[in-house]
Amino acid sequence: MKNMLLLSSSKYKNTGYLEHTLPWLQNFLADYRGKTIAFVPYAGVRRTFDEYEKTVQNALSYLEMNIVSVHHGKQHRDIIEQADVIAIGGGNTFCLLKQLYEHNLIDIIREKVNNSTPYFGWSAGANVVGASIMTTNDMPITYPPSFQALQLFPHQINPHFISGKMQGHNGESREERLAEFLLVNPTALVYALPEGSALHIQNEMATVLGENPILCFSENMECGTFDINTTFSY
């Protein structure tokens, strides 16, 4: 059974790093105490892999699990193959996907998650689960071999979604950017995850968690809303 927890962000309002995810992760990983999480740190542009690993280990110590970054493996995929759970951290989605391709991790992650290995990721780690990374918010832009992502979720994901424009901002709003994407890709669906929200995906069903409803945009910016604790098929 496919079992994934996709988190919009690592923080919500004034909470600490991954603090708001605590109850979700405790429930999500209730049967995995003492097991190993393979952590993928590639999105962390402004910190070393060791620093990112330590940050996540400290934040998730309450899970009582062994968190090991893939960069410790002679081949990074070795850590993925041996792990009980897979996690991908947030940061820059372009850098993340580029290195997933470079280290030959796309297929092994896809295979393991499709065969019941739990997966969780935040921000870029949620974005990369979708069909492609073409609805990321990120800079700098690096060029992976393809913008096609893990495709464990068949639609587009836009984390950190904020509706409307901030005062004094004269650029495009998030809705306007997504509308442009849907003009170019009219058959796509974009699931927008506001801050503090998450999707728990089990096979072909998804449940909304968190503080804010999740939005689904389609051609002509038709918008569906999925309220907190709603379960829907995708």
From Swiss-Prot:
Compartment(s): Cytoplasm
The protein's name in its UniProt record: Peptidase E
Signal peptide as annotated in the record: none
Organism superkingdom: Bacteria
Keyword terms of this UniProt record: Cytoplasm, Dipeptidase, Hydrolase, Protease, Serine protease
GO function terms (MF aspect): dipeptidase activity; serine-type peptidase activity
Catalytic activity field: Dipeptidase E catalyzes the hydrolysis of dipeptides Asp-|-Xaa. It does not act on peptides with N-terminal Glu, Asn or Gln, nor does it cleave isoaspartyl peptides
Family: Belongs to the peptidase S51 family.
SUPFAM superfamilies assigned to the protein according to its UniProt record, in alphabetical order: Class I glutamine amidotransferase-like
E.C. designation(s): 3.4.13.21
Gene that encodes the chain: pepE
Taxonomy of the source species: Bacteria, Pseudomonadati, Pseudomonadota, Gammaproteobacteria, Pasteurellales
GO terms under cellular component: cytoplasm
GO BP terms, alphabetized: proteolysis
Residues annotated as the enzyme's active site: S123 (charge relay system), D138 (charge relay system), H160 (charge relay system)
Role description: Hydrolyzes dipeptides containing N-terminal aspartate residues. May play a role in allowing the cell to use peptide aspartate to spare carbon otherwise required for the synthesis of the aspartate family of amino acids.
CDD domains reported for this sequence: GAT1_Peptidase_E (cd03146)
Chief localisation class: cytoplasm
